[in-house]
Amino acid sequence: MLAIHGWHWGTIVQNKLHRNINLIYGLAFFHSFMIIVPVIVPFFISKGLSLAEIFYLQAVYASTIVVLEAPSGYFADLFGRRTALLIGSVVHGIGYLCLNFADDLFSLIVFEIIVGISASLLSGADLALLYDTQKTLREEGTIDDGKGIAHLGFIKSSAEGLGALLGGALALWSFDILVVVQALAAWMCLILALGVVEPPYKKESQGVDHLGIGRILKHLLQGDPLLRKIVIAIPLYSLATFHVAWLMQPYWESQGISLSMFGVLWCSQSLVVALASKFGFEIERRHGAAYALT
């Protein structure tokens, strides 16, 4: 009887973990479904901001992410990835809700800080949950697919592309409606995060956890040169990507390109990234990570 009960309970857990994968994919989709990003510069200009103030806003956003990237990862390890997802999703929704009422530089700075906090909490938490979920299912012999990370990248980039098309169309109609739709998409992250379960993963004892951040920083700064370079490269790459993105939009506007075409152009580059994510896994599997990065 106990064996039957144990088998039944194990089946329930497996079903929840399998459902986890789809929920994480869905959450990643709506988190990346940023319909406002392809027209963010014209949107800020419509609020009366100069180009210098717009870049100041992006500096605030990028700085928030860089400062909180490591602490948010430690928070997720300490309190659980699901907790980080839930809090990040709530903050994400609040941020875009506040954007509906932001009309000056100060309120937009507050918005950038809020969404920067949410991006730090959500960044990596979905990936870690997906990895732990698939690792558990592989150990139990119920899944043998190692392409989950590649699929996650493909879904995120595809969401950016689809969001860009919708954002370009809505921007022609009304920025106010665009922001409302963006807020609704943001709150979808919380709805999906509520269904996610925490997969089992190795966690250090409570006594060690208090020393964990010091040991992690020491290992990062002194122990592993490759890891140190990766940690430095990731935020620098993100910052460079942000600034190129914000520079392109004023250039497009100066060339007389319509807002609807902003969405088409942004969608095109997002689809290229999606395809690279899709096939990058095979390149890495066959030739190694160093070759793929090169």
Map each language-model feature to its residues.
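Transmembrane alpha-helix termini and helix-breaking/packing motifs in multi-pass membrane transporters
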Residues: 160-181, 250-256, 282-283
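Symmetry-related core transmembrane helices of the 12-TM Major Facilitator Superfamily/SLC fold
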Residues: 177-195
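Helix-loop boundary and gating motifs at the non-cytosolic
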Residues: 14-67, 225-267
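Juxtamembrane intracellular "pre-TM" segments in multi-pass secondary transporters
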Residues: 7-18, 197-232
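Helix-to-loop junctions at the C-terminal end of transmembrane segments
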Residues: 69-80, 171, 275-289
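C-terminal ends and interior cores of transmembrane alpha-helices
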Residues: 90-103
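Cytoplasmic helix-loop-helix junction between adjacent transmembrane helices
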Residues: 113-157
